[in-house]
């Protein structure tokens, strides 16, 4: 164990005597260097504060002049917090004496993590009331929110810490402050079921506001299934009759899909239906649908007590009612709407009803692409689920275990929607796509292409497939490390796209069809690797031969001056007879001479040849 690690471990474990011995013979500069260095992203002081070693904290500050504000990585409940200063770590862990000492030594009371979380928020999160009071007494700002606009009062409400919420309110916390998504502290109470805190907030004049999705605290409680909040708010003076009805119907839908309690759902739906007809002079009927939805098996919402009673004998119809109600009340843009459609589809798939699953998932995917930003993780999850489902169906079909077939149209439809997602992302120039999300979407598309190659098709269908792949390639999308689709097709890491296996990469079939549809075999990634380099790194001679036959330069070099043959295992070269001399032209040799002898060529040869020579740098 090196000295740096030994110092770090001693500070983390509170072994002051050991640390003193380790530093005894070191100069002031050496001590400063050892104390300021990070191990696993954290300084010794940060670890000492995290684990509450008061004597160690004071020794590091007073004897070693450790920097009191330097943040780092700390772990709480399995989550790594980045950029956490020592005061934040001590506050989150509940070490009051360490907090007091750090503040006495000049720590900034409002210093934040990378996500803009303050020490006060950290203390509020885990319910450390005494630390909350101490921080506030030392000028902690109650209104500093994290990157999501979530305040200390909001997190106290969500976590159910009533005494802390009350203290913050007494100190003047803004009860109606909104987060980035429009949530208020009332929403947090509704989502967590904290009824007592909600009542207290209302006493402090909290307003029933809608969030960014149009959700009131009452609807939030219905979505999360907190019946105590729903019962309380449906009797509140600020709640209209229509709002009460919607809340009860939505709560019933939650009982169907989240709690799996069909009788409980019927109870709330009956309450809502009775309210609709309670005033015979002003019956509140459900809106008449413009069209019936095939994915819901053309179901219609029940509109009378008699129709509601008829649902008891048909559980499947009840589940469709839940989806219809949720979509009507929450709207297609709310994440829960598409989530539970997908959930219901997955249940059908588990029971072998793949057709119903595919129909529901397609409907959810259309909803997501119409309402979410390009390359949304939710949309990517839907596309991946399709790839995993189709792979499972094809495998079982091949084993003769499955009656349902995967059609070309099913697969092709999802491929088209996947390409559409890439088009949407590339068109959004003001907000460039996240490379990791784009990489995932590209990988999913390659898996779908791989699956399509396993499905028989007509000449017309084959033309449409290649036309779509051509359109995809013309977008020139790039993933992680600036990988093109062809780079991804020859890389083994493309195999790992989700939890379940779909296709194995490198894939000769996918590589072949990409090349046939116009993929550039000499395209470069961020390290100047061509697909041939990546195929060599993955020891795949068959793909290398295909790339070379398609025009890939065998002796082209990357940023590290390596050719593909430099990267390929020598045994593979001998075994598969990939001899460099067989693929090296006189042009290539001439280009190498120019590069090796540093002959200045720019402006002296045609531009096309300049590009060719640059491949051999």
From Swiss-Prot:
Q: ANK repeats located where?
A: 2-31, 40-70, 82-111, 115-144, 148-177, 181-210, 213-242, 481-523, 527-556
Keywords, comma-separated and alphabetical: Acetylation, ANK repeat, Disease variant, Repeat, TPR repeat, Ubl conjugation pathway
Q: Does the keyword Acetylation apply?
A: yes
Consequence when changing residue 125 to A? Strongly reduced binding to C-degron with an arginine at the C-terminus
The protein's matches in Gene3D superfamilies, at most eight in alphabetical order, are given as: Ankyrin repeat-containing domain, Tetratricopeptide repeat domain
Q: What outcome follows a substitution of residue 462 to N?
A: In a breast cancer sample; somatic mutation
At which residues is N-acetylmethionine found? 1
Please describe the organ and tissue distribution of this protein's expression: Widely expressed. Highly expressed in kidney, cardiac tissue, skeletal muscle and testis. Expressed at lower levels in other tissues, including cartilage.
Consequence of changing residue 121 to A: Reduced binding to C-degron with an arginine at the C-terminus
Subunit info here reads: Component of a Cul2-RING (CRL2) E3 ubiquitin-protein ligase complex, also named ECS (Elongin BC-CUL2/5-SOCS-box protein) complex, composed of CUL2, Elongin BC (ELOB and ELOC), RBX1 and substrate-specific adapter FEM1C.
* Protein name per the record: Protein fem-1 homolog C
The record lists the organism as Homo sapiens (Human)
Gene of this entry = FEM1C
């Amino acid at each position: 164990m090196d000295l740096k690690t030994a110092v770090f471990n001693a500070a983390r474990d509170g072994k002051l005597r050991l640390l003193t011995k380790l530093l005894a013979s070191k100069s002031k500069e050496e001590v400063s260097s050892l104390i300021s260095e990070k191990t696993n992203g954290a300084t010794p002081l940060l670890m000492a504060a995290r684990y509450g070693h008061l004597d160690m904290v004071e020794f590091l500050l007073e004897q070693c002049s450790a920097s009191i504000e330097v943040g780092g990585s700390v772990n709480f409940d399995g989550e790594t917090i980045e950029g956490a200063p020592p005061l934040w770590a001590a506050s989150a862990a509940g070490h009051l004496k360490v907090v007091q000492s750090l503040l006495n030594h000049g720590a900034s009371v409002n210093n934040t993590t990378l996500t803009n979380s303050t020490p006060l928020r950290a203390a509020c999160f885990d319910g450390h009331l005494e630390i909350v009071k101490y921080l506030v007494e030392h000028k902690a700002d109650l209104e500093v929110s994290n990157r999501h606009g979530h305040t200390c009062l909001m997190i106290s409400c969500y976590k159910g810490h009533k005494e802390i919420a009350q203290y913050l309110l007494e100190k003047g916390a803004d009860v109606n402050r909104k987060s980035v998504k429009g949530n208020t502290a009332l929403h947090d109470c509704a989502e967590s079921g904290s009824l007592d805190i909600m009542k207290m907030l209302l006493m402090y004049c909290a307003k029933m506001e809608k969030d960014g999705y149009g959700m009131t605290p009452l609807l939030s409680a219905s979505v999360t299934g907190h019946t105590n909040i729903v019962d309380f708010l449906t009797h509140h003076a600020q709640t209209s009759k229509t709002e009460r009805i919607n809340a009860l119907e939505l709560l019933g839908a939650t009982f169907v899909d989240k709690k799996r309690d069909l009788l409980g759902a019927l109870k709330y739906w009956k309450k809502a239906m009775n309210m609709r007809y309670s005033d015979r002079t002003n019956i509140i009927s459900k809106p008449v649908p413009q069209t019936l939805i095939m994915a819901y098996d053309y179901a219609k919402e029940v509109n009378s007590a008699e129709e509601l009673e008829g649902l008891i004998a048909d559980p499947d119809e009840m589940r469709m009612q839940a989806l219809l109600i949720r979509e009507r009340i929450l709207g297609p843009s709310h994440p829960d709407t598409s989530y539970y459609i997908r959930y219901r589809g997955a249940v059908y798939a588990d029971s072998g009803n793949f057709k119903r699953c595919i129909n529901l998932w397609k409907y959810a995917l259309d909803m997501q692409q119409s309402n979410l930003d390009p390359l949304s993780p939710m949309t990517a999850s839907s596309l991946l689920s399709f790839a995993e489902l189709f792979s499972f169906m094809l495998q079982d079909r091949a084993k003769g275990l499955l009656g349902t077939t995967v059609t070309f149209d099913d697969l092709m439809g999802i491929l088209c929607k996947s390409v559409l997602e890439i088009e949407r992302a590339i068109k959004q120039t003001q907000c460039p796509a996240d490379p990791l999300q784009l990489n995932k979407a590209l990988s999913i598309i390659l898996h779908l292409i791989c699956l399509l190659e396993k499905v028989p098709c007509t000449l017309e269908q084959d033309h449409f497939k290649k036309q779509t792949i051509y359109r995809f390639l013309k977008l020139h999308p790039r993933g992680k490390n600036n990988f093109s689709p062809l780079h991804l097709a020859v890389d083994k890491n493309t195999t790992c796209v989700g939890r379940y296996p779909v296709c194995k990469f490198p894939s000769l079939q996918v590589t072949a069809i990409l090349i046939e549809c116009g993929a550039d075999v000499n395209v470069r990634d961020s390290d100047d690797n061509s697909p041939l380099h990546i195929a060599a790194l993955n020891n795949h001679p068959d793909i290398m031969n295909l790339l070379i036959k398609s025009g890939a330069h065998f002796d082209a070099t990357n940023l590290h001056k390596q050719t593909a043959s430099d990267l390929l295992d020598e045994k593979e070269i001998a075994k598969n007879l990939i001899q460099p001399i067989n693929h090296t032209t006189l042009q290539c040799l001439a280009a190498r001479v120019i590069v090796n002898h540093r002959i200045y060529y720019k402006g002296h040869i045609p531009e096309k040849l300049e590009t060719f020579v640059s491949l051999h740098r």
